[in-house]
Structure formats: structure tokens, C-alpha cells
Amino acid sequence: MTMNNPNLTMIARNWRDLIRPKGISIDAESGTQFYAKFTCEPLERGFGITIGNSLRRVLLSSLQGAAATAIRIEGALHEFTTVPDVVEDVSDIILNVKEVVFKAATPKTYSVRIDREGPGPVYARDIQLVEGLSVLNPDHLIAVLDKKGPLSMELTVNVGRGYVPAERNKTPTMPIGTIPIDALFSPIRKVNYTVQNARVGQVTDYDKLTLEVWTNGSVSPADAVAFAAKILKEQLSIWVNFEESEETSYQAVMSDDEPLNENLFRSVEELELSVRSANCLQNANITLIGELVQRTEQDMLKTKNFGRKSLKEIKEILANMGLSLGMKIDNWPQLLERWKAQQAQA
């Protein structure tokens, strides 16, 4: 279905008349590789919770990351055992390995090793990396050798999303002694959001959304939010059952067979508005109805002393004329001059 008839154009006002946020601001002072605070305003009442909660859930559940999914330690057949000359038992080593932050360039399976002799600590930087895989917390402790050792282990690293239990990481081709481990692939550590009142002109019942995002460093908070928004957009697009052939707008064309709406050239004084609304238009230097209809609701609400009551009044009067706020009139100055010239010749 294509939006190219008056009924669908009217329906389009369901979303085009809603106020849209000015943009997203990021707190530069507190922002790091791992944390950022985003602010988005103004939003329609209730949209702060709707958008904030949706982004939070997608951020926590649906972004891809890399994590260790299996480990094989020489001398250990299962996780409930110990390794000679190693302070930690196998269970503790596995817990430490799960906290290593990997970053993968491509979504595939990586196999890496650690071969270390003691005495001394074994860090994430001791992992013998392969092309396309990096470690973002190289100083993370994996184990401690209290004697000469050695400690030899092989790690399997995969790319995925969300939490995957150890049972699902087990494959039939795993060598004997390989221990599948549960993996948390998500690069997101924590997400918080708050909603406060926002002001547009004299109206204070809009929403201001503040979103805080913590990551493990494999993706920046800004990119993480962008990915989450893209996921939501892709999932919601299937619900739109029509296409817009072009941006729905009011094309003002002056011709003999299709005369322009004469109301556009009337003075706003003829609208017989309340004193408050009329004064607001006067303060905004709006003298003609054609100038008024080209203003959006957001523009009008930014006008001093202009509130929801005045907005409702103007919208109702314009609707009775077949007009509305937010119209686009091509070449308005030229059309106005042509109309004045025609009136002078009449």
C-alpha cells in the first residue's frame, strides 16, 4: 500500500504531529571507553520509558561479542581437579578465563594457547593470540604458578550473543579433556535509564531520557546504543504495512484548474483566536495563515507564552479550513507575490 491519497496523508499526521527530539547529547566529561551518559529530549509523554526500556533490553540481550567457550588444561581431565604447581584449582582457573575480554574481528572460532613456566603469575597477555583476535584486559590474572610449572592450556573462543550455558558449548568433536564453559558474549556490563520532565516553551509535560551504558571496552557505548537502535528499527519495520512514495507535504501550485487554498493568504486576525493565542502569533511575527501553517507544533510550543491550549485551538480552526500545522509550501514568497499581483489586477 502506498501513501498517495488524502486519507493516508491524514493518517500520516499520527506520527508527523508528534514532537521529535532535538538530538542526542553525550556527557563529554564523564565519558570513557567503557562508559557514557546520553541525554535525549524532548520526547512525547511516555516515550521516555518506552524508548529507554526498549534500548536497555536490546543492549543487554542482543549485541554480539567474543568469549571463551571451552578450555583444555594439560593434566586436568575435568573441572573438579587440580593442576600440579598451580595455586588455583581448575574451577578457579575457569572463572578467571571467563573474565578475559576478547575482541574478534570476524565471527568465527578461534583457538589460542597459554604455555607458561613458573614460578609467577599468568596473565591474559600470556595468551598466544592469532590473527583477528585481541585481548582488551591483558593485566587480568588467570593463575599463579608457585613452582616451575609448567602450565599449558588451550582456549576455544567464539562469537555469539547473550548468555550460553556450558551444555550448549559442548560439541561431539571435542578432544578428551576439553571442558565446555558457559559464556557471556554480551559486551554490555550495565544499562540504566531515568526519565524526567522536559520543557518546550511553556509546556513542561514532555519527557527527558537519560541513558547510561557501561561496556567491557570491545565496543564503545555510542556504537552499542546505535546497534541497539538499529536492531529495534529492523524488528519494527515489518509492522509498517504501507510505503510512502515521497515525503507527504503540501505542494502549493497556483493554476487555473486547481486554485490555491485562498485561506493561506488571509490574515491570522481573521481566525478569531483568543487574546492569548493572538498575542503569541503577533510576538512570533506571524501575520498570514500561510505563514502559520508552515510552522510545526514544536515551533509553536517554543513561542513565548504559547501552550497546549493555544495549540489545540489553532489546530481545530485550521482543520476546519482543510489546513494543518507542519505543511510544506514550495516557493511561498513567490506564490504570495503572485497572489498580491492578481489581487491588484482584480
Curated annotation (Swiss-Prot):
Its EC number is 2.7.7.6. Residues 260-346 are annotated as: Alpha C-terminal domain (alpha-CTD). Residues 1-243 are annotated as: Alpha N-terminal domain (alpha-NTD). Disulfide bonds: none annotated. InterPro entries: DNA-dir_RNA_pol_insert, DNA-dir_RNA_pol_RpoA/D/Rpb3, DNA-dir_RpoA, RBP11-like, RNAP_asu_C, RNApol_insert_sf. SUPFAM superfamilies: C-terminal domain of RNA polymerase alpha subunit (SSF47789), Insert subdomain of RNA polymerase alpha subunit (SSF56553), RBP11-like subunits of RNA polymerase (SSF55257). One of its GO terms (molecular function) is protein dimerization activity. It holds the Pfam family RNA_pol_A_bac. It catalyses: RNA(n) + a ribonucleoside 5'-triphosphate = RNA(n+1) + diphosphate. GO terms for cellular component: cytoplasm; DNA-directed RNA polymerase complex. The N-terminal domain is essential for RNAP assembly and basal transcription, whereas the C-terminal domain is involved in interaction with transcriptional regulators and with upstream promoter elements. Homodimer. The RNAP catalytic core consists of 2 alpha, 1 beta, 1 beta' and 1 omega subunit. When a sigma factor is associated with the core the holoenzyme is formed, which can initiate transcription. This is DNA-directed RNA polymerase subunit alpha. It comes from Sorangium cellulosum (strain So ce56). The gene is rpoA.
